[in-house]
Amino acid sequence: MHTVTQTSLYGKDLLTLKDLSEEDINALLAEAGELKQNKIQPIFHGKTLAMIFEKSSTRTRVSFEAGMAQLGGSALFLSQKDLQLGRGETVADTAKVLSGYVDAIMIRTFEHEKVEELAKEADIPVINGLTDKYHPCQALADLLTIKEIKGKLKGVKVAYIGDGNNVAHSLMIGCAKMGCDISIASPKGYEVLDEAAEAAKTYALQSGSSVTLTDDPIEAVKDADVIYSDVFTSMGQEAEEQERLAVFAPYQVNAALVSHAKPDYTFLHCLPAHREEEVTAEIIDGPNSAVFQQAENRLHVQKALLKAILYKGESSKNC
């Protein structure tokens, strides 16, 4: 008999971290820690995850595919050329067809509204593997990494430096829910979305944490326990690259900036990283960096999530 983390997630979707309670997140992080120690748990015999990718990926594809295999199931990779979505089939029809073939859908796409529609029309759970607005699986891995290194989440100060993007939105909401104080420094015109900021501030009031938004990276990293960076130009923004590099230059995480953080700060980055753009090689390859521990943790939190969504708690013999 395999143990099952108690969450409210069985059979449900994960579109943003707003879908999870503090108790759910704590349970998922505990389960992820267990799965990190005992990687192979063949509980998913006969279960299949459909993985829809409209944006390319290394970590998302490999971690979900390996995770399903380690849990005894299988994963189907579906690119745009494998589906009829790009040739006029509706999201609703795709959702209904896949619901008859597989047990869950993970989708990595551009428009968040597409994930919402897929979840509405599907009869099976849908997991957001990334949209332009949110990246909840990454934030779960971030929280696990912070907890592993700092030993706690409540009271930890996290500073995010750079574009107010999907990663920033999910990190901000996750930190606010779990009691981390988060400061986000972004240039004017590149701030986080109001809807994400307002949600995070509401959660922070409940958890006793704080959310600070600024355009000053030094202010953001002052006495920080964790410094987090992401690329200045995300997929789909290539036409803006030169403009962005100029605007974001003062937001590079380098030795001068991290000197304002705590001496034992931890550097995180969701990867892929562009060394000497958003972060210097000295920092990302230095002793305070935990980016590869963070990347590995994508596997473990996603396995915990899949187990919570798809596994009732039968013995592996009957699963």
UniProtKB/Swiss-Prot annotation:
Residues at which L-ornithine binds: N166, D230, S234, M235
Top-level class of the enzyme under EC nomenclature: transferase
Reaction equations catalysed: carbamoyl phosphate + L-ornithine = L-citrulline + phosphate + H(+)
GO biological process, alphabetically ordered: arginine biosynthetic process via ornithine; citrulline biosynthetic process; L-arginine biosynthetic process
Alphabetized Pfam families for the sequence: OTCace, OTCace_N
GO cellular component: cytoplasm
TM annotation in the entry: none
Cell location: Cytoplasm
Gene3D superfamilies, alphabetized: Aspartate/ornithine carbamoyltransferase (3.40.50.1370)
Keyword set includes Cytoplasm: yes
Entry's EC annotation: 2.1.3.3
Binding site for carbamoyl phosphate: S57, T58, R59, T60, Q84, R108, H135, P136, C137, Q138, C270, L271, R298
Domain of life: Bacteria
Keywords, ordered alphabetically: Amino-acid biosynthesis, Arginine biosynthesis, Cytoplasm, Transferase
Molecular functions per Gene Ontology: amino acid binding; ornithine carbamoyltransferase activity
Pathway: Amino-acid biosynthesis; L-arginine biosynthesis; L-arginine from L-ornithine and carbamoyl phosphate: step 1/3
InterPro entries for this protein: Asp/Orn_carbamoyltranf_P-bd, Asp/Orn_carbamoylTrfase, Asp/Orn_carbamoylTrfase_sf, Asp_carbamoyltransf_Asp/Orn-bd, Orn/put_carbamltrans, OTCase_ArgI
Family membership noted in the UniProt record: Belongs to the aspartate/ornithine carbamoyltransferase superfamily. OTCase family.
Biological role: Reversibly catalyzes the transfer of the carbamoyl group from carbamoyl phosphate (CP) to the N(epsilon) atom of ornithine (ORN) to produce L-citrulline.
PANTHER family named in the record: ORNITHINE CARBAMOYLTRANSFERASE, MITOCHONDRIAL (PTHR45753), ORNITHINE TRANSCARBAMYLASE, MITOCHONDRIAL (PTHR45753:SF3)
Protein name: Ornithine carbamoyltransferase
Name of the coding gene: argF
